[in-house]
């Protein structure tokens, strides 16, 4: 139905090509019959407008990075589609028509303007490999969420980024991969919205976590940069270290690693080595390098919703000895995966 003051009525949206052909064939036959009987043509002023839809040929691949466009193409949701929406959408064309006094159809066409093309750094082959192994992990040991980033260390380009909660970009509101039909039917609008946003989230950018052992490389790097260690030092690991009234354990908590060099500490993921190094650094230098390495700061990646972890990082002013110790091996503070990468 059209508006009362409208000069035309939009009769139907999203007609199939078969429906269009059927109408054209039938209207042509009827108009020919009217002409044959010397009657004025009765079916006039009807035309069809092409509608373009964004199609994602790779389905769920890199879905949390790409995001999706709404059906009418007016807005992007999540990922690149949302971040670059204003560059991607372009302007829709329009075709207007009116009947002249002698019942001839006149048309006015306003051409469409294409949006810009965005090329990502995602390597499809690497992306599929990431997704394959995340799927295997989830099918085996499993976790609430699993994620991975593959970055070119020379340029910072993201070659792959995956979160285990994937969805089909061509059908982004389909929850059947995570909920039964009975569960979906029982959801109200709020519950459905929460389920959708949970499925669409990009853990690598939108969420924070305790990074754990990858932090150890940064602890060593800061100490070496300040000439506090040179890498030849050896530390004794007995499975724990008493700091600030706490026995803080190593991964080898029963017997420890024994005498362990800095390099061995990285190879064996020794917490005691890291705690000793951070104690040599002190809170001022350790906090300084946390900032230099970008922890607690947004990276500015061109994806929406990057989490702010500024309040989840210790400063030199509020860092106690036990905080320093646990931070040295990536616990007791949060960052995003993209910050860690």
Predicted regions and their residues:
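Beta-lactam-recognizing serine transpeptidase/beta-lactamase-like catalytic domain environment
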Residues: 100-107, 122, 154-214, 218-341
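Solvent-exposed, polar/charged alpha-helical surfaces in well-ordered, non-transmembrane soluble domains
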Residues: 13, 21, 25, 59, ...
